[in-house]
Amino acid sequence: RRTVVYIFLTLFCIAFLAIMSASTSPLFVDYCDGDSSIFMLIGKAISMGKNVYTDYFDHKGPILFYLNALGFYMTGSKTGVFIIQCVFLSLTSIFMYKTARIFAKTFASIICVIVTILAFASTISDGNLSEEYCMLFCMIPIYLSIKHITKNPDTPHPKRYMFVYGVCFAACAFIRINNGIMIGGIVLVTLVTDFISENIKEAFLNVLMFILGILAAAVPICLFFLIKGTLSDMIFATFTFNFMYASEGSAEKNSGA
């Protein structure tokens, strides 16, 4: 029964993206517009041996570009990117369903997932945006944290969950860092709960496991760019440039006010 639900959700996600993700959908062969076209251009360039951030520049994280590159490696066209989108959204929908099942029965949970994904149509734009990939890395911590709170509220937060939160946060950070803020909120609530309960040791271990999770994802990425000789370029584009961009935007708003 669970397998049937997962297959249905996967097919629904494929149909949704085929209609809504105009930049990558096989139904829109010649469509090219928006941020997605930039991401695919850089992804295609990577698949042809070019270096992101030095040969081509954009201020998104490397995971986004290498997912696009993987799509072009797979098929040589944007169809590969569409396939990767389908995988990510399908997995996201499954974790949405698993989360909903904590509170509702099967049919109601499926409806919740469908409504949520349909609501995503208002922000998907032309598809293949950073949020689309980060949703999976956000849904995993949401599911795990809610599962723990509802199933085992009186037990310490599992350390392996905190490690997973760290990995997911790093994944979001290396796509678009502000997309991972929600995960930071989950960790913060967990730590506040530990301090209120006077479980200082638990709080320390939770922080440690979260940091280890971040390092588990961040270190291989940084080593990869270090070997390529473009680590400083990647850090500047992914983090420094965006902090500068956000700071300048805030300054302009304040001066305008």
Go through each PLM region and give its residues.
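Short acidic/glycine- and proline-prone juxtamembrane loop motifs at membrane-interface regions
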Residues: I124-C134, G229
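Start-transfer (signal-anchor) and selected internal transmembrane alpha helices
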Residues: R1-S23, R101, K159-M162, L205-L212
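Transmembrane-helix signature of polytopic, membrane-embedded enzymes
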Residues: M96-L118, M135-L136, P153-R160
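Loop-to-helix entry region of an early transmembrane alpha helix in multi-pass inner-membrane enzymes
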Residues: P62, Y66, M74-I94
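Membrane-interface alpha helices of multi-pass inner-membrane proteins
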Residues: R160-I177, I183-T190, A216, I221
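Transmembrane-helix motifs of polytopic, lipid-linked glycan transferases
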Residues: I83-F103, I140-L144
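Perimembrane helix-loop-helix junctions
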Residues: M182-L215, L223-I227
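Membrane-interface transmembrane helices that cradle and orient dolichyl/undecaprenyl
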Residues: P141-V164, I196-E198
